Amino acid sequence: VTTGPGTPTGAEAGPRGVRARPDATDRALIRAARLGDDLAFRQIVDRYGPQMYRYAVRLVGGSESDAAEAVQEAFISAWRGLDAFRGESSLRTWLFRLVHRRAVDLQRKRKPTPVTDEALTGLVAPAVDNALQHVLDEELLHELQAALNELPWQQRAAWLLREVEEHSYEEIGEALGVPVSSVRGLLHRGRRTLAERMSRWR
């Protein structure tokens, strides 16, 4: 994932020559990036890019190109909006909110695509009982795919953020722009739908 047009080169780094360490905190990386340290921003990309891509590719139904585009645009928005980030949420939550919005925009422009078997392989364990974690045959994947495809967009997003990315309810609410009470409702309805569809596998 690249940071997109407008990212400064190393020679254009901030006036104080700030360089963030590899183990720098998010807050330190943001401070350095605001001063023009492109390496600090690249550390942010390296730190959160893989998580954002994993979330995006499953959210958009397994389209790697759409997921990559959503992540790319999210980081471009993040770079351009560094000064607007006030730290009211964590950096991770802010970035996930950006990639979620970009993914939503992409899906509005295109017809919904089904979740692919490849995207579901890593989701089977969270979705079924422990006794079925080793039953990864085609029929199970097909049924889980169909169940996830039936979930409304917000329910699917909430489920992925909670069950796959292990976000807190508060983080999910901030990423989706809804209160925690709504997050609980989305997860409850999504889990109930999945449980009903997957009941014969229990």
Regions picked out by a protein language model, each given a short descriptive name:
Residues G14-P15, R19-D26, T113-L141, S168:
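Internal acidic/polar
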Residues E69-I76, S89-R101, G185:
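Structural recognition of an alpha-helix C-terminal capping motif at a helix-to-coil junction
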Residues R19, R34-Q43, R54-E73, V180, ...:
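Short, charged helix-capping/linker segments at alpha-helix termini
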Residues H100, V104, L144, Q155, ...:
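DNA-recognition helix of helix-turn-helix
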Residues V1-Q51, A125, N149, E196:
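N-terminal module of bacterial RNA polymerase sigma factors
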Residues V45-E64, G81, L148, T193, ...:
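Amphipathic, Lys/Arg- and hydrophobic-enriched alpha-helical face
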Residues R34-L35, R58-G62, E73-S90, K109-K111:
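Sigma70-family region 2
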